[in-house]
């Protein structure tokens, strides 16, 4: 996939995210240092759940933002190295923060349709 197609997939995801407003949203976040083996035992995981209220793109810092009540989550657009739809209403972003530090963000929307 070329860079423009990859970028367009991410843009399309955020252009259509408003259909999930009001939906329960799960974000599973993992920090790891070895994307080749991706050993779950060597990855630090966090889980957050909230109702998605709004989303936006913050030009300062190139951040993709999702917000819920008492919850705010950002993904660095310029650090995304992978984006895929894992299933119906399930998505995964991988950001690279240094040579060997990666953040995996799995998003699941509990969407009624």
Show the residue positions of the predicted features:
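Short beta-rich binding modules
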Residues: 1-17, 21-113
